[in-house]
A protein has these predicted regions:
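Catalytic donor nucleotide-activated moiety binding site of glycosyltransferases and closely related
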Residues: 119-131, 210-272
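A nucleotide-sugar donor-handling region in carbohydrate enzymes
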Residues: 116-126, 130-207
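A donor-sugar binding/catalytic signature common to diverse glycosyltransferases
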Residues: 275-318
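Leloir-type glycosyltransferase catalytic cores
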Residues: 171-188, 316-353
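Active-site and donor-binding regions of nucleotide-sugar-utilizing enzymes
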Residues: 59-152, 293
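Conserved donor-binding/catalytic core segment of Leloir-type glycosyltransferases
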Residues: 82-87, 203-217
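Phosphate-centric recognition/catalysis
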Residues: 1-103
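Structural motif
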Residues: 83, 207, 241, 283-284
Length: 353
């Protein structure tokens, strides 16, 4: 959240969150009360800041009611000495981090004289903080979620450290200069992996990146279908090469594809930053609608994104706004229930006809 302070009629903070319309709540320190706004089409967003609309449209946000009352009192009493920091990587989703946080942070820190400190959260799996200038004052926060949810820990980090948080939170275009800087940065971090894959793919064309997924949004029969795809492409383009990407839980599908006669490079289990570095070698891709789309955001190229209708766009789309758009094609799947309610509640198994 980013907290805006208003002294009249009552001291309160507007809490700006992670998803549109960004404003998700109002904190009243005197009452130790947090109210939330969850409607994307809320009249406050469309028509202004009428207090009556605020009062009529709020509901209690239970998690943040667990805030330490003494810490809040101390925070409010010492407001004049609070430090402004910009935040990054407090939300686990790296796609949101990249297109909604980092693009703005990069512009602020490289194109302006912004000297605010950077507070990095526990979810910087792309190590984006390292892609910003070394001169930035910075610190990091880790959370223990064993007792309370991370939003509460986040709020406690604010009050205990005496911070004003500025959280980047809008969809911002990704300049070509920034994309090129990220590409070069990832390759500099992983030169050995890049060189090894490049050597294995010498004289291969086209090179197709295949991202596998074994947990939610997985593709039933993924190994069989992608093996058939690799063999079909190879029949038409004998020098084609394929790079397999994914977490270790896709090993069974990966082995099925590796058993084909196609030229297939096993890159399963690589670090996310290694994948970003080596994605530069691909001419096209096939991947699920997931954090994998950050590969396209950093290094756009033609490809196919698959997922359930309603979860992904209906038409070709751009995962992040760029200066030179490259659209991702879309393939929709059909949800298949397993009959296991606890499994189906959090895993979407997709079957593509």
């Amino acid at each position: 959240p980013i907290f805006y302070r208003f002294d009249d009629p009552e001291l309160h903070y507007i809490i700006i969150g992670f998803h549109p319309p960004r404003m998700v709540g109002i904190f009243f320190p005197e009452r130790k009360q947090v109210m939330s706004l969850m409607n994307h089409d809320h009249p406050i967003i469309r028509q202004g800041w009428d207090p009556d609309r605020i009062a009529l449209s709020c509901v209690m946000l239970e998690e943040l009611l667990q805030v330490n009352a003494d810490a809040v009192d101390q925070y409010c009493a010492s407001a004049d000495s609070h430090r402004l920091v910009l935040t990054q990587a407090f939300r686990p989703n790296v796609g949101h981090q990249l297109r909604e946080e980092f693009s703005l942070l990069w512009k602020l820190y490289t194109k302006t004289d912004c000297d605010a400190a950077l507070l990095t959260g526990p979810f910087d799996v792309l190590e984006l903080a390292r892609q910003l200038p070394d001169t930035i004052p910075r610190e990091s926060v880790t959370f223990d979620e064993s007792e309370v949810p991370w939003p509460v820990n986040y709020f406690n980090a604010v009050v205990n450290r005496g911070l004003f948080l500025g959280r980047m939170g809008c969809r911002s275009h990704m300049p070509l200069e920034m994309q090129q800087a990220l590409q070069a940065g990832f390759r500099t971090e992983h030169p050995e992996a890049f060189d090894e894959i490049q050597k294995k793919l010498k004289n291969c064309w086209p090179v197709v990146w295949l991202t596998l997924r074994g947990h939610n949004r997985k593709w039933i029969g993924e190994g069989f279908h992608l093996r058939r795809l690799a063999e079909t492409v190879t029949a038409k383009y004998p020098k084609a090469g394929f790079i397999l990407d994914g977490l270790p839980d896709v090993r069974e599908s990966a082995d099925e594809i590796l058993a084909s006669q196609a030229t297939v490079i096993d890159f399963i289990g690589s670090r996310f930053t290694e994948a970003q570095a080596c994605f530069h070698l691909a001419d096209a891709y096939v991947m699920p609608y997931s954090n994998s789309c950050t590969l396209h955001m950093v290094n756009p190229r033609p490809g196919v994104v698959h997922g359930l209708k309603g979860w992904i766009p209906d038409e070709p789309f751009e995962p992040a706004a760029t200066e030179s758009p490259v659209m991702a094609r879309v393939v929709h799947g059909v949800k298949c229930e397993t009959g296991n309610e606890s499994y189906d509640a959090w895993v979407t198994t997709c079957d593509y006809q």
